[in-house]
């Protein structure tokens, strides 16, 4: 019995020793695997609908540069949709590392949710504005010539524009309409009357600029599509020769920001690569891709190179001219604000 007990004891000790060695070996393998994983990172880019074409060109170039510079591989998950919808998705838990949205107020909402640190604008060149554009009029009939915003109402045209509750592009359209009155000397009351008349002739409110384009082009609705100039240029490059014009008397500067989502990059361990990607977007190489996709580049050298494809606007006003995003949001787009009052009258 004593021999048997000793035998069992020796066997148990051997098992424990082997188990301990296996455990040590397992930990070492995990550590090595973790090291390999750290060399392969993933970024989630959340952007608004009409930027897809540009980012599909830019991202592979950044991936190549990052590999050459660091020896590390980075892959991207990409999400595109209406800027307002994308903003809500990030606030509600979509773990974006980088957001590139249609307007600064959307980034500010993510900041207010505690996901982006204050003063994010100072973290990238050009106050974090990565592209610019203006509003364009796309007309169904070639003989319909439009030079000014006022003609939309004067000619009683059916207008297609997206819903500013979900689409950043639609907010720019709304502000372009409003500012065309107030920036030319009109009163807020006159601006509201003008905008009301336009929206009386808006048959449907798609959720984003891309869907608005589909309503106009594919479904054949409307006389005029209000759209980003960059979308119109891109469509022309793809062979869609729909006539369009840019109102050059007054127009709004559509300034689109980009930002790192601080809480998510810290959680994912991707801050370094996320910040590098944001900075890459301001390089001439990336800015040329934005220009090729119809955006007005913020790099001055690239802007001069592509100047011929953009009409000069005589009076280019900004959101700041309308009081800034906080005032604009409260006055126009909050629940019960001017936009809701206008659509309630339809």
PLM features: residue spans?
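N-terminal segment of the mature folded domain
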Residues: 28-166
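Extracellular/periplasmic juxtamembrane helices and adjacent flexible linkers that interface
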Residues: 2, 28, 265-346
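Bacterial N-terminal signal peptides that target proteins for export
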Residues: 2-11
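Periplasmic-binding protein-like
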Residues: 129-136, 195-199, 206-207, 238-271
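Short helix-loop capping/hinge motifs at secondary-structure junctions, enriched
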Residues: 142-148, 166, 179-187, 264-272
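Ligand-binding pocket segment of bilobal, Venus flytrap-like solute-binding proteins
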Residues: 184-249
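C-terminal motif of bacterial Sec signal peptides marking the signal peptidase cleavage site
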Residues: 19-23
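Short beta-strand->loop
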Residues: 46-48, 139-141, 157-184, 198-202, ...
